[in-house]
Amino acid sequence: MPSFDIVSEVDLHEVRNAVENAQRELTTRWDFRNVEASFELNEKTESVKTTSVSEFQVQQLLDILREKMAKRGIDGAVLNIPEEMTHSGKTYSVEATLKQGIDTPLAKKIVKMIKDSKLKVQAQIQGEQVRVTGKSRDDLQAVMKLVREGELGQPFQFTNFRD
């Protein structure tokens, strides 16, 4: 029976390239001349820290980062940006974490969404991924479309397609 896995993974190498490109753009931007602003990627905690001297500039930095990530083929929804900024001394900073894997509540929501669609497929949670099995390829492709169109706040990839 045909099956595939729904996963949510981020290529850290591409994220590193996007952060380096964003840092490079900072040196050429006129509005960031003579301003202490930076991007820092922490691969162990899978987070990107943006730092600048004002809240507005931190928001601009996040926009630059999203733009560079989009150019590298990474969806901007992988960034989990906190509501409040950290303010210490004269700098503002935001540490945005990268969403890796599908957590259990979201996986349950995906399985429920698939079951509510009345397609003839079975969905089961396997760790940080969801396995979908069905008799027809068309049903599996309908599930892919359903998950892509569902407003779940996280980008998904479909891997391990077996026939």
From Swiss-Prot:
InterPro entries: DUF520, UPF0234-like_C, UPF0234_N, YajQ-like_sf
Organism superkingdom: Bacteria
Signal peptide stretch: none
GO molecular function: nucleotide binding
GO CC terms in record: cytosol
One Pfam family from the record: DUF520
Gene3D superfamilies: 3.30.70.860, YajQ-like, domain 2
Entry keyword set: Nucleotide-binding
Similarity section: Belongs to the YajQ family.
Free-text function comment from the UniProt entry: Nucleotide-binding protein.
Record's protein name: Nucleotide-binding protein PMI0103
Organism of derivation: Proteus mirabilis (strain HI4320)
